[in-house]
Amino acid sequence: MSEIRLYVTTTEAKAEEILDLLSALFGEEDFAIGTTEIDEKKDIWEASIYMMAEDEAEVQSRVEDALKASFPDARLEREVIPEIDWVVKSLEGLKPVRAGRFLVHGSHDRDKIRPGDIAIEIDAGQAFGTGHHGTTAGCLEVIDSVVRSRPVRNALDLGTGSGVLAIAVRKLRNIPVLATDIDPIATKVAAENVRRNGIASGIVTRTAPGFHSTAFSEHGPFDLIIANILARPLIRMAPKLATHLAPGGSVILSGILAGQRWKVIAAYSGARLRHVKTIWRNGWVTIHLDRP
């Protein structure tokens, strides 16, 4: 199901006021709200709220009523967020991506690998994750840091997409990794990429909606859980995800817009996890938490 963005284009000051209005209107609900700078010199900003298509009619009605009362000149616009369109670009348009010690590249760029690179070969295809998106690159940076500095005996990549993050963990350390996704096409693509990278024996791929699979109890609890999904489902699954984390374990979360980070951190703090750090990439954040 598509994700929808409703937004108003305005000045920075007005965008902040509209953000406050939306926060008051939807404060107890799981809709992502944020502001984005479009043009610094011209003072053009956007105030946005994100929702799934099934919620659009109700959210749009409430936003329009609120804007009409407080910002009668504001014009509400709509955008359908592409789910995988960017992934299917021609291979020629995808340059190698460096994140930490990792080099994520397509088969056409094997000559770009340098000595010391941890190379992951992922061609553009049907599943999310070639390293070019800020969320994937951010996760790779934090994975590199966590796996080098903490004891990690097993890992879970929840919402694996192309499998790039599971492959990264396995290439860093010879530990078992469970890679799951709700989409069977993604699971198939991930399994193919695991084989392409020569580590098929170390990664188990499974199609599983949320945590509704015996695979989690069979392979967990986990020292490292990575979930590069979206803020709303991440918030919802916080209590359940925390039950699958081993004592002293780490969680890496992404798919989160900068303005959503505090809600996500609050949800996981409520699940007794501690915020370690947040890194920023192109308007997206990756959050590292652990269990003390």
Curated annotation (Swiss-Prot):
<dbReference type="InterPro" id="IPR029063">
    <property type="entry name" value="SAM-dependent_MTases_sf"/>
</dbReference>
<dbReference type="GO" id="GO:0032259">
    <property type="term" value="P:methylation"/>
</dbReference>
<dbReference type="GO" id="GO:0005737">
    <property type="term" value="C:cytoplasm"/>
</dbReference>
<keyword id="KW-0949">S-adenosyl-L-methionine</keyword>
<feature type="binding site">
    <location>
        <position position="159"/>
    </location>
    <ligand>
        <name>S-adenosyl-L-methionine</name>
    </ligand>
</feature>
<dbReference type="InterPro" id="IPR050078">
    <property type="entry name" value="Ribosomal_L11_MeTrfase_PrmA"/>
</dbReference>
<keyword id="KW-0963">Cytoplasm</keyword>
<comment type="function">
    <text>Methylates ribosomal protein L11.</text>
</comment>
<feature type="binding site">
    <location>
        <position position="228"/>
    </location>
    <ligand>
        <name>S-adenosyl-L-methionine</name>
    </ligand>
</feature>
<keyword id="KW-0489">Methyltransferase</keyword>
<dbReference type="InterPro" id="IPR004498">
    <property type="entry name" value="Ribosomal_PrmA_MeTrfase"/>
</dbReference>
<dbReference type="Pfam" id="PF06325">
    <property type="entry name" value="PrmA"/>
</dbReference>
<feature type="binding site">
    <location>
        <position position="136"/>
    </location>
    <ligand>
        <name>S-adenosyl-L-methionine</name>
    </ligand>
</feature>
<comment type="similarity">
    <text>Belongs to the methyltransferase superfamily. PrmA family.</text>
</comment>
<keyword id="KW-0808">Transferase</keyword>
<feature type="binding site">
    <location>
        <position position="181"/>
    </location>
    <ligand>
        <name>S-adenosyl-L-methionine</name>
    </ligand>
</feature>
<protein>
    <recommendedName>
        <fullName>Ribosomal protein L11 methyltransferase</fullName>
        <ecNumber>2.1.1.-</ecNumber>
    </recommendedName>
</protein>
<dbReference type="GO" id="GO:0016279">
    <property type="term" value="F:protein-lysine N-methyltransferase activity"/>
</dbReference>
